[in-house]
Each structure stands twice: as structure tokens, then as C-alpha cells.
Amino acid sequence: MVTGTFTILNSSGFHARPAGLFVVTASRFRSVIKVASGKQTANGKSILSLMLLGATPGAEITIEAQGEDEAEALNALAELINGRFGEEP
């Protein structure tokens, strides 16, 4: 199992488009992916679950990946988040 903590950098947080991009990226991997924000935990492969986290800009989230491709999954998701989900700075 690998984990990482990240700050949501895009201007709108985990709304539909970023959550959708996250799910598309997470679904490329076999690992189980969980995302936590505050005391809530979400399935990283469920757009509705991620949106219900209510992670706003500046929020910290923790991603946990467990499985055969866990490191690759975490790296891909980190790149997506740190790249502001493709949003210009």
C-alpha cells in the first residue's frame, strides 16, 4: 500500500470535470484507490463518491492505492492533481 497527501490546486475543487478526470485516470489501474478528505473517505473510481467529499480549492486530500500497480497509480494521480487537472494557473 502507498499513500500520498496532496493539495487541490485547481480553482473549482473536486467538481464534475476534475472528479471525472480523476476517475478516468484511477480506472486505468487494477489497484484499489481510496481518497480521504477530512473524516470522509471515497472510492477513487466513483465520480459521485469523489464529488461528495466536497474537496474545495486548497483542501488536502490523502490518496491510498493498494494493489499490483499501486505506485504507478499514485504517481499518475499525483501528476493529475499537481497539474491542476489541466487547468491553466
Locations of regions flagged by a protein language model:
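Compact, glycine-rich, soluble single-domain proteins
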Residues: 7-48, 52-57
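Intrinsic-disorder/low-complexity, polar/charged segments enriched in Ser/Thr/Lys/Arg/Asp/Glu/Gln
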Residues: 1-5, 60-62
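A composition-driven signal for long, intrinsically disordered, charge-rich low-complexity tracts
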Residues: 1, 30-31, 39, 84-85, ...
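C-terminal structural segments of small proteins and small subunits
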Residues: 56-89
